[in-house]
Amino acid sequence: DQYIKIRNNSDEDLYADGMMLILSSGLNSGMNSEMIEGKDFRKECCAGNAFYCIPGNGQDVLVKAGESLIVVNNAQNHTIGNPNSWDATKADFEWYDVSSNENYLDIDNPDVPNLDKWYASTLTVQVLHNRGFNAVAIAMPPVGLTAEQFLAEYPLKDAQYIFHSPNGSDYTMPLRNCYRVPNEW
């Protein structure tokens, strides 16, 4: 029953068409890592390894001032299996993944629109970390940018960080299969 609530906290109505949800690359759970000097990209962009966009043509997904969108992993009635959960069948959108492993299939609710999947590094289904180790960000890519253009123009190459192990050793760790989202978005 994972979900993301996106609130329009402005005093004007806004359209969410094209809004990108980004799942960060790397773990954000502690102070046991640091960026390599001269290779810290964070002032220019964020790194992600999963990108989903709200579909629409510019004026299809209105979010009125003070209201919210709910995006869920599986738009199912979760109270059936857990009475303490909630009914996600009324969500605005769900993210859906076609899995390459028949043991880990996603559930698609045809009554809830799917986000447009631009990329996810997983070959199965994308889930949010149960303790928030990976950050979630939102961005508004330029109007007209396609998934194909994004993947061709925004790879994050040679990104690395230093992991400080509890055993006292430091390890240089690469960020693999990730793309950059400029902070201006």
Positions of predicted regions on the chain:
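Activation on beta-sandwich/Ig-like modules and their edge loops
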Residues: D1-W185
